[in-house]
UniProtKB/Swiss-Prot annotation:
List of residues that carry Phosphotyrosine: 239
Domain of life: Eukaryota
Protein's name according to its UniProt entry: L-lactate dehydrogenase A chain
Enzyme Commission numbers on file: 1.1.1.27
PTM annotation (N6-succinyllysine): residues: 5, 118, 318
Originating organism: Bos taurus (Bovine)
Originating gene: LDHA
InterPro entries cross-referenced by the UniProt entry: L-lactate/malate_DH, L-lactate_DH, L-lactate_DH_AS, Lactate/malate_DH_C, Lactate/malate_DH_N, Lactate_DH/Glyco_Ohase_4_C, NAD(P)-bd_dom_sf
Alphabetic keyword roster: Acetylation, Cytoplasm, Isopeptide bond, NAD, Oxidoreductase, Phosphoprotein, Ubl conjugation
Family, per entry: Belongs to the LDH/MDH superfamily. LDH family.
Crosslinked positions (Glycyl lysine isopeptide (Lys-Gly) (interchain with G-Cter in SUMO2)): 57
């Protein structure tokens, strides 16, 4: 007796389903799910896989997204605790990690996350040996180094979300001050994602007009308009959002989808993201920091050589020394 499906549909060929544009997200917390919805709404993948250790939450998030399939153009959304669901991914985004406990030192948090990465990374490598790794978990620069060391991947394929969001926050705040859309406000925040990031004031411009040329005090303590406060707001903004709602999610999710788009579509756009910076700016250690990188289908193919002031370069070097101080203590 023919089934309803057989009566309705005549099959013409036996297909083997191998995804061409698969994206995996590891960790289905607030950040992971914000990445997932942002990626789904940009139609970047033909399959999205979610992985986590919390099975009920994982299944619930998967089902909730699947129920929105009519409104999306991603035909397959899967999940599992077992990494076999991640097979054949082009891009794997890692948002999983331990949350900082009150009073916990950053070094202790890092070591806890290293232990988590020691489980995650080999599983990803096993099922998607040719993927790009995009690390979002904090502290992102150190964990990108950890992912690079554990994976054995070439450095172009291990990317940290870095200062992509810091720079976006900066451009938003700059736009608010000037009454101009952030897309038309240009400015770069480089270095370590977080407290010691470096705003490159010399490059801040609208329509190619340098703000520093118009207003030489820009970004200095002598500045009557206190533009330096804009960078301080960028540094403090995550803490403020966490204090108000408990975590950050939407902006980082959108920022990650922006990076995913450059990779999946081979756009070769320039982003301030974390890459192995050894050999640049007099840095001699294996540290990952954000510099402007050309991002495409092979990950980071090139970096843009930014002209920094002596102070800016010194800040970058200081960040590198701090990171190396932590990295050399890590137990793999």
């Amino acid at each position: 007796m023919a089934t309803l499906k057989d009566q309705l549909i005549q099959n013409l060929l036996k297909e083997e389903h191998v995804p061409q544009n698969k994206i995996t997200i590891v960790g289905v917390g607030a950040v992971g799910m914000a990445c997932a919805i942002s990626i789904l709404m940009k139609d970047l993948a033909d399959e999205v896989a979610l992985v986590d250790v919390m099975e009920d939450k994982l299944k619930g998030e998967m089902m909730d997204l699947q129920h929105g399939s009519l409104f999306l153009r991603t035909p397959k959304i899967v999940s599992g605790k077992d990494y076999n669901v991640t097979a054949n991914s082009r891009l794997v985004i890692i948002t999983a990690g331990a949350r900082q406990q009150e009073g916990e030192s950053r070094l202790n948090l890092v070591q806890r996350n290293v232990n988590i990465f020691k489980f995650i990374i080999p599983n990803i490598v096993k099922y998607s040996p040719n993927c790009k790794l995009l690390v979002v978990s904090n502290p992102v620069d150190i964990l990108t180094y950890v992912a690079w060391k554990i994976s054995g991947f070439p450095k172009n394929r291990v990317i940290g979300s870095g200062c992509n969001l810091d720079s976006a926050r900066f451009r938003y705040l700059m736009g608010e001050r000037l009454g101009v859309h952030p897309l038309s406000c240009h400015g770069w925040i480089l270095g370590e994602h977080g407290d010691s990031s470096v705003p490159v004031w010399s490059g801040v411009n609208v329509a190619g007009v340098s703000l520093k040329n118009l207003h030489p005090e820009l970004g200095t303590d002598a500045d009557k308009e206190q533009w330096k406060a804009v960078h301080k707001q960028v540094v403090d903004s995550a803490y403020e959002v966490i204090k108000l709602k408990g975590y950050t999610s939407w902006a980082i999710g959108l920022s990650v989808a922006d990076l995913a788009e450059s990779i999946m579509k081979n756009l070769r756009r320039v982003h301030p993201i974390s890459t192995m910076i050894k050999g640049l700016y007099g840095i001699k250690e294996d540290v990952f920091l954000s510099v402007p990188c050309i991002l495409g289908q092979n990950g980071i193919s090139d970096v843009v050589k930014v002209t920094l002031t002596h102070e800016e370069e010194a800040c970058l070097k200081k960040s590198a020394d701090t990171l190396w101080g932590i990295q050399k203590e890590l137990q793999f």
